[in-house]
Amino acid sequence: MPSSAHLQDSPPLLSRTLTQNEGQTSLRQSSSCGPSATSASESLSGYTESRIPHSEMLQEKFHGIILPESPAKLLCCCAVIVVLSVAVVALSVALSVKKTPQISTVKTYAACPRNWIGVGNKCYYFNETARNWTFSQTLCKEQEAELARFDTEEELNFLRRYKGSPGCWIGLHRESSAHNWTWTDNTAYNKLLPIRGVEKHGFLSDNGISSSRDYIKRNSICSKLNSYTSQCQ
């Protein structure tokens, strides 16, 4: 058993141990919860609180400025896409048409009055009443026409095929054998077919075009430009 002196000496040692523990505890508290720590914590809390209003302000600006422009930008993008799509389609169609050209045949039909026959851009009327050249021209004028004129071989062949009688007055005439042949509107004859004879008025015969004196009575052919042309493809 320990002696009484040893027991009496123990309290001072225990007292020193407790004192050291309290000092260490106090030191830890001062290092963790001292004024500097408290100040740092308060600074961090203030920084966080000061940042919150700034972020809220950015959110308000985002919702107030950017979002209202978004539908307009979306519509603009859609419009651009539509325009580009239409342009691409139009270009494709144009290229396809260019690659495969269409060949169309246009037939022209003269629109002529009743009992008139259309050839090219003219209408012809075959008058079976025999008259001299001057009176035959008068009959044609009454129908807003002239004694027949032809400018192409097609028209000439048509007249020769359908003239009927041995000879029909046409619109060729001249002042004398020394002058050139002209039509009733005084335009020059293109000499599509030679004219036989030395007289001053022309008529269409089985052999072509011949000249005769104007007082001879013959059938006649009138011609005029068609009023309009209808086209069929």
UniProtKB/Swiss-Prot annotation:
PROSITE patterns: C_TYPE_LECTIN_2. It comes from the Eukaryota. Residues 95-233 are extracellular. It holds the Pfam family Lectin_C. The chain crosses the membrane at residues 74-94. Residues 16-29 have a biased composition (Polar residues). The keyword Transmembrane applies. It is a single-pass type II membrane protein. CDD domains: CLECT_NK_receptors_like (cd03593). Glycans are attached at N132. Keywords: Cell membrane, Glycoprotein, Lectin, Membrane, Receptor, Signal-anchor, Transmembrane, Transmembrane helix. Residues 1-73 are cytoplasmic. Residues 1-45 are annotated as: Disordered. Residues 30-43 have a biased composition (Low complexity). It is found in: Cell membrane. GO terms for cellular component: external side of plasma membrane. Residues 119-230 form the C-type lectin domain. The keyword ATP-binding does not apply. GO terms for molecular function: carbohydrate binding; natural killer cell lectin-like receptor binding. Disulfide bonds: none annotated. Lectin-type cell surface receptor. This is C-type lectin domain family 2 member D6. It comes from Rattus norvegicus. The gene is Clec2d6.
